[in-house]
Amino acid sequence: MTEARPAQEWNNVNSEVVAQFRSDNGKISSGMFKGARLLLLTTVGAKSGKERINPLAFTRDGDNYVVIASKGGSPTHPDWYHNVLANPEVGVEVAAPSGVEQFTAHARIAQGDERQRLYDAQAAVMPGFAEYQKKTSRAIPVIVLEPRR
């Protein structure tokens, strides 16, 4: 689902996806993420202190949402992951029957068996995630978003 692209190009793609998500009740109807099940994760920049919004694929685990810091199998973690480590209270926007639901959540990093179970669940739905792990020597972090409703 991701590939090597310059950072500015990804920023442009993210901005377009965020705009489409918000204008079409959480649906993505065009572009490279057409039809993808995404949420918007709002973090506070670890260095800048500015809000950052990233569209991310997700799965559910009970009441929680699960996102993966794959960065397409890159050798480095995505910036949003560093933001989560520095500031684990995040904002989430996700499609719901009545439109887009917004809530705050606490982000925690899954470890051990839980991490593997959640990663495997995402890879079962989106096989690209299995390929991402093969492309890198780093353990790709799995983040559990625990809603604060």
Which functions belong to the PLM regions below?
Residues A4-R5, K71-F129, K135-A139, P147:
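Short, structured beta-strand-loop surface elements
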Residues D63, R148-R149:
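Short loop segments at secondary-structure junctions
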